[in-house]
Regions:
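Negatively charged, low-complexity tracts enriched in Asp/Glu with abundant Ser/Thr
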Residues: 1-20, 79-80
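Mixed-charge, Lys/Arg-enriched low-complexity segments
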Residues: 42-80
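Intrinsic disorder/low-complexity segments
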Residues: 11, 23-25, 51-53
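A short, structured beta-strand/loop element
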Residues: 19-48
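Extended rod-forming repeat segments used as scaffolds/tethers
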Residues: 16, 31, 57-58
Length: 80
């Protein structure tokens, strides 16, 4: 199965800009599925999937800041 790039975006959180790529995939039954690839860093990705790009955009807008802030907190706690 092949993914088709349908959209690219970038989310700004604090001083970071996180690139996001949205893909479309056809299932074996012919239905469309969408995925978002969130690139947090080299070798550090989050992949989400849903039935629509709109839902993925909403989930991404909530998940990316939460992920970045939780990792910042974990680093601060580990350093202390």
């Amino acid at each position: 199965m092949f993914r088709t790039l349908v959209k690219t975006d970038a989310l700004a959180v604090e001083d970071q800009t996180v690139p996001v790529r949205y893909f479309e995939l056809r299932t074996l039954r012919g239905a469309k599925r969408y995925s978002a690839e969130i690139l947090l860093g080299p070798g550090d990705r989050i992949i989400l999937d849903d039935d629509s790009v709109t839902n993925l955009e909403a989930r991404t807008a909530c998940l990316v800041p939460a992920t970045i802030y939780s990792r910042m907190l974990a680093r601060t706690t580990a350093a202390a």
